[in-house]
Design a protein with these regions (language model features):
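Interdomain hinge/linker elements that couple catalytic modules in large macromolecular machines
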Residues: 2, 148-325, 334
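A cross-kingdom feature that marks ATP-driven nucleic-acid transaction machinery
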Residues: 2, 25, 34, 49, ...
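Pre-Walker A adenine-sensing motif
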Residues: 2-19
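Walker A/P-loop nucleotide-binding motif
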Residues: 19-37
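Short glycine-rich substrate-engagement loop in P-loop NTPases that contacts/grips substrate
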Residues: 55-85
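Conserved P-loop NTPase "ATPase switch" module shared by AAA+ and STAND
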Residues: 82-100
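Short regulatory helix/loop adjacent to the ATP-binding pocket of P-loop NTPases
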Residues: 106, 123-138, 153-155
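Structural recognition of the conserved hydrophobic beta-strand(s) that form the central parallel beta-sheet
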Residues: 114-120, 141
């Protein structure tokens, strides 16, 4: 079964011949190697590139062990470049190549070499790899499957597919499992034996219980504001564990750096400035989030909000959490000041939109609640309410667009 990743293939095609090292990043098991060695290679051939001009090397293959020596590998590549036409060099698990940074920099000096790499050590599973090749690297970040990609292989209705996607996420080795029990087992194994170990080893964390407890707290509170000091107080009160807010923020940064979670900052829409704390965190994959807390607390409202955030990021938006400050007077003439929340403030180039997530709109009161912050924004940018049920897209008298979660998740904004 082949799951097409058209968005990423297009990004790879757009980056050809740009003189930079194409670095494919993303959490383990999200499909980086398959994208490069199957989908991208297939596209190159369809575009007329013959096999002699595609140089492949999977360094984790025992048969290629000899080429982990930097000199032998470099000479091997040089021996295959026989003319002035472009050669595409595809390298997997490149961290197993000794002195790989020096070798890759050397390959960049070959004028007719276009280089693409993936890796899965601590450096490649974090943002450090881009720092290593600053000015010479071009990152293509791969996420778990989108709902659209998931539905391309799911045998069932959109509604049942959506329920399963919220439950098990979009990691390819998970969704390809035949039963729910198998999906749960794979997710738990991946968390304990892969993702957790990566973060612990990379950052030399000795007390894995504290890290796991922190992630459980973040998992339980997706869509909620997170303040490290309040987390520290919770550890002390509920767990009788003394751990400082600075340490907790460092642990959160470790998880963010490993692409497991993402931070959304708060943005004052009217004041046009960022608010330092608190902020929100969303999980890169909902299946991993659910596995962390043993598939308890499966509230569709919060899962839907997380899924919308991830889809916006896939579509290339920078995403913040909006705050609209309202000043007024009550019926007694007493002045008040309150803050209304906009779930997402989304920016991409000159585009901006404001989005509210609502599982359902059963009454006019609920509709008024959801649009209360949006109708106070009058800067001319799109305002959208995404509803977690089927409906025909429509606009209200304020110009606010109402659309179903299916229309949003299956189409670009």
């Amino acid at each position: 079964m082949i799951i097409e990743r058209k968005r990423y293939i297009q990004q790879l095609l757009n980056s050809r011949h740009n003189g930079l090292l194409k670095i494919i990043t993303g959490i383990r098991r999200c499909g980086k190697s398959f994208l490069l060695f199957n989908l991208f290679k297939r596209q190159l051939k369809l575009d007329g590139v013959d096999k002699e001009h595609i140089i492949e090397m999977a360094f984790d293959d025992f048969g290629n062990k000899v080429y982990r020596d930097p000199n032998k590998f470099y000479q091997y590549v040089k021996s295959l470049i026989k003319d002035g036409r472009m050669y595409y060099i595809l390298l997997d698990e490149v961290q197993m190549l000794k002195d790989f940074e020096d070798v890759l920099n050397g390959l960049l000096h070959i004028p007719n070499a276009d280089i693409y790499v993936t890796g899965s050590n601590a450096k490649f599973l974090s943002k450090d790899i881009i720092t290593e090749f600053r000015g010479r690297g071009y990152q293509i970040h791969i996420s778990p499957l989108s709902f659209s990609e998931f539905m391309s292989v799911y045998q069932g209705s959109q509604e049942s597919g959506w329920v399963e996607y919220l439950q098990y996420g979009g990691l390819p080795p998970v969704i390809l499992q035949p039963t729910d029990e198998d999906k749960i087992r794979v997710l738990k194994d991946l968390w304990q034996e892969t993702y957790l170990i990566d973060i612990l080893n990379r950052n030399r964390i000795k007390n894995n219980a504290e890290l796991e407890e922190l992630l459980c707290m973040l998992s339980s509170g997706i869509g909620g504001l997170v303040n490290p000091q309040k987390l520290s107080n919770t550890f002390k009160t509920n767990k009788n564990i003394s751990i400082g807010s600075t340490t907790l923020k460092t642990y959160i940064d470790y998880c963010s750096d490993a692409f497991l979670i993402e931070e959304a900052k708060r943005y004052d829409v009217k004041g046009r400035k960022y608010i330092s704390t608190p902020m929100k965190y969303y999980f890169t994959d909902l299946g991993l989030r659910n596995a962390l807390i043993n598939f308890r607390q499966i509230e569709k409202t919060h899962l839907m909000e997380n899924a919308i955030y991830c889809e916006l990021r896939r579509q290339g938006f920078n995403v913040d959490v909006g705050v609209v400050t309202v000043n007024g007077k009550d019926e007694n003439g007493t002045s008040y000041r309150k803050q209304l929340e906009v779930d997402f403030v989304c920016n991409k180039g000159s585009r901006r939109c404001y989005i509210q997530s609502s599982l359902s709109l059963p009454s006019q009161d609920k509709i008024e609640q959801e649009i209360n912050s949006l109708r106070r924004i009058d800067d001319g940018f799109e305002r959208i309410v995404i509803v977690g049920e089927s409906l025909i897209s429509n606009r209200d008298a304020n110009g606010i667009l109402f659309m179903s979660i299916y229309d949003f998740m299956l189409n670009d904004l």
